[in-house]
Amino acid sequence: MYSHLSFMDKVKLEQLLLSKIFLKKNGEQNISAIAKYLNRHRSTILREIKRFKTIDEYSAYKSDKMYYEKRKKNNKRFKFTEEQLNFIHLRFNVYHDSPSELIYRYFLKFKVKFPVCVKTLYKWIRLGFYGFLKQNLRHHGKKYKRKGKSDNRGKLTDFKSIWDIDNKVSNVGWLEMDTVVGKDHKSAILVLVEQLSKKYFAIKLENHTAREVEKKFKDIIIKNNLIGKIKGIITDRRKEFSKWREMEIFAETQVYFCDAGSPQQKPLIEYMNSELRHWFPKGTDFNKVSQKQIDWVVNVINDKLRPCLNWISSKEMFLQNI
């Protein structure tokens, strides 16, 4: 893959030209030998030298300065219309669409291809072009690191393991369940996600007890008319889910628990929780967040066009299958 000469490459080239180590018998510079020494193609070295009238005039500093001046003039940024810019700002800075989703929505809206690829759009966002705000990316534009800590918030005994699941033919009707905890563990949200459609549900908890979790679980089931439609629920071995038998009876389903300290066994809910955390970062006091605010965020999440669903939303996929 071709790459431009770095400043240090140019310094080495200048030193080699001045030292006259690679001279031919006729006194001319052996460009092929220099290129081989620098591990570059002969044409690359020739193009670099031809920036100057003669080889003796070559200067690494001047060459680098000329390079950056040309780069500044070569501004290929696309000129959007006012309507297009407003749409981009709305989708990215308000609804926080991912770059790939923004490109797809742009195509649906204007019936023309987005002017750049996903990789270049990420570059635009990080450089702040067109008013893009980097903090609206997932994880606010920072690299995500797993801490590898085990969960020590209380464990359950006497339950069904995920290894007890038999004859799971598809993800239709299978839910994953979790709680998202707020500041100082004094507030929380109960969350569920349907595996096939990625439809996300979230409701505030008044407290972090098993009885409250059971109550809010029933509210979600009733509101979404899910009684008898759930094939199974996968969750953690935490004490707030100790009323799992009551949940099974009410929803006419089965509840299965992951191995201790193994959140990777329910990867979808962990991923969806990170989307919720994008709006409500760690340290958020959910006692100060209304259910209306949570509903707005959940609606934005469920309205996202997802590549894994062939560019339809979780909301639409859920209605088609449940």
Swiss-Prot record:
Transmembrane segments: none annotated. Keywords: DNA integration, DNA recombination, Endonuclease, Hydrolase, Nuclease. One of its GO terms (biological process) is DNA recombination. It comes from the Viruses. The keyword Disulfide bond does not apply. One of its GO terms (molecular function) is nucleic acid binding. The keyword Hydrolase applies. Gene3D superfamilies: Ribonuclease H-like superfamily/Ribonuclease H (3.30.420.10). Pfam families: HTH_38 (PF13936), rve (PF00665). Residues 153-322 form the Integrase catalytic domain. InterPro entries: Integrase_cat-core, IS30-like_HTH, RNaseH-like_sf, RNaseH_sf, Transposase-Integrase, Transposase_IS30-like. This protein may encode an integrase, which is necessary for integration of the viral DNA into host genome. Belongs to the plectrovirus integrase ORF3 family. This is Putative integrase ORF3. It comes from Spiroplasma virus SpV1-R8A2 B (SpV1).
